[in-house]
Regions:
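A glycine- and charged-residue-rich anion-binding loop/surface
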Residues: 1-223
Length: 223
């Protein structure tokens, strides 16, 4: 049996009324994508940064995911790119996601990761993504990593001493992020009267010109 806690946001009902509850299919699917991506992310972080990485907190919503982990310094741009590439590689492999309910001792023998200081019962649910990721977890997941579609890290920051935070998007959220970046990039090209091929050169030229003009202004002020 599974118990759910809900909140009435519209309408009303009374004790004794018979009601039918349904899950918001889209929110459930998007949440599952972000949750499964979090498992892939943790393993990718351990590959890139080292086995000292442990989960220190997590938030999964239909719109995004947030993952806190133990690490002693800010991640470099190269490290972030490597982690992102590994996660997307596992998504592209379309790995079946399997769940098993095992006795706690049998679950530990599989090598599945457990949350530090978390108390578990006699049986636990293990979520396996091929040989890449095995974790104790009771949450909702996709049935295949390919259903996540895509993964994009949008920020990496510190939240406490020795704890870093990654925020990321998957699926349609990642696609919308890329479209927004593309629009901003095109707007910059238009403002600079440049093309995507020469916009960096054009902006560098404009900056040099501004610097030169500012020097001339300062020179005139001193006369």
């Amino acid at each position: 049996r599974v118990g759910h806690v809900g909140k009435v946001t519209a309408g009303s009902f009374n004790v004794g009324d018979k009601v039918t509850l349904t899950v918001d299919e889209k929110k459930r699917i998007d949440t599952a994508k972000n949750h499964s991506a979090t498992h892939l992310l943790q393993e990718a972080l351990r590959i890139v940064l080292g086995n000292h990485v442990e989960q220190a907190g997590s938030l999964v919503t239909p719109d995004r995911l947030r993952f806190d982990f133990t690490h002693f310094q800010p991640m470099t741009e190269e490290e972030i790119e490597k982690v992102e590439a590994i996660v997307n590689e596992q998504i592209a492999k379309s790995i079946d996601v399997e769940t098993k309910v095992l006795a706690i001792e049998d679950a530990k023998k599989t090598g599945a990761k457990a949350l530090f200081n978390e108390k578990y019962g006699d049986t636990v649910r293990v979520v396996c993504m091929g040989d890449f990721s095995k974790e104790f977890c009771g949450g909702t997941h996709v049935s295949n990593t390919g259903l996540i579609n895509s993964f994009k890290i949008v920020s990496e920051s510190g939240v406490a001493a020795g704890v870093r935070r990654i925020e990321a998007l998957t699926g349609n959220g990642a696609f919308a992020y890329y479209k927004d970046i593309e629009k901003k990039y095109n707007d910059i090209c238009k403002a600079a009267k440049a093309t995507p091929a020469n916009v960096e050169e054009k902006i560098a030229h404009m900056q040099a010109e501004i610097k030169s003009l500012n020097s001339e202004i300062e020179s005139l002020k001193n006369k």
